[in-house]
């Protein structure tokens, strides 16, 4: 069974050589865009964050001049919560700014590339992104995009099936691509997400529970969820399944995005990860809200993380 799933996910679910959970679905951040608006304005899906900024501003300005005063260029998750950690990690990693804490436990967030990434995002506020994005989670961003009032959106794969639903005003007008690079020297970076299923040691019916886990993580159920809900399978073979690709074409085109997604530093920071993430998203949110400058905020963040880990030596 383990060989049928992405190896990295199986490794993540293995403790002391024993498989303790089963991969259920894999997530990674994606860029959604309005195919019709890009075609109307002679634009292509952006390859860099600068291209996204320029394209979003251009289309937003022209659409507003034509009477759509609710149009915004780009919506995403800017609330001070785990979703902002995911968004900001994508910005930072795409600029070659690292992943907050490296695999050896060294704190790396205070660097020029990371500061550039966060400052770039701060420049979107009240230009191509509404000020309200500072309190957006996934559903707030999707609400604006799916109502037809945004050119671009960063979100997870689940938003695809909803945008394509019978009640959606943008049905058949949505495209999906990899997130932009942080400049010509950068690379596309998508934060890894997803879920696993396990059986509690305190279960009164461990065998029944294990059977349920195997059913829910099996090929039939993963295929159904991929087709009906755009949940990315953890089973490699389903990325070549014609019915899955017909329902969610991006799963084939963006296969490498999911395989090479950037992991949050939860493994190396262990039980302190929640504190690390909390410090990170608050530092980023402060910059986005215009309360601090990126360089100063990241320097303060690095100092806080060093205190938390005794200089990165004790996570």
Identify the residue ranges that each predicted region occupies.
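Short helix-loop capping/hinge motifs at secondary-structure junctions, enriched
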Residues: 36-46, 62, 98-99, 126-127, ...
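Short, solvent-exposed loop/beta-turn-alpha elements that line the ligand-binding surface or hinge
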Residues: 1-5, 64, 73, 78-81, ...
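Paired acidic/hydrophobic, glycine-rich loop segments that form the ligand-binding mouth/hinge
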Residues: 151-155
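Glycine-centered hinge/linker elements that transmit conformational signals in sensory
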Residues: 56-58, 103-135, 179
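Short helix-initiation/N-cap motifs at beta->coil->alpha
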Residues: 49-54, 133-146
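Hinge/lid segment of periplasmic solute-binding proteins
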Residues: 1-28, 69-70, 84-85, 171-179, ...
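Extracytoplasmic/periplasmic solute-binding protein
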Residues: 11, 15-24, 29, 53-106, ...
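C-terminal lobe and pocket-closing loops
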Residues: 158-171, 182-282, 312-315
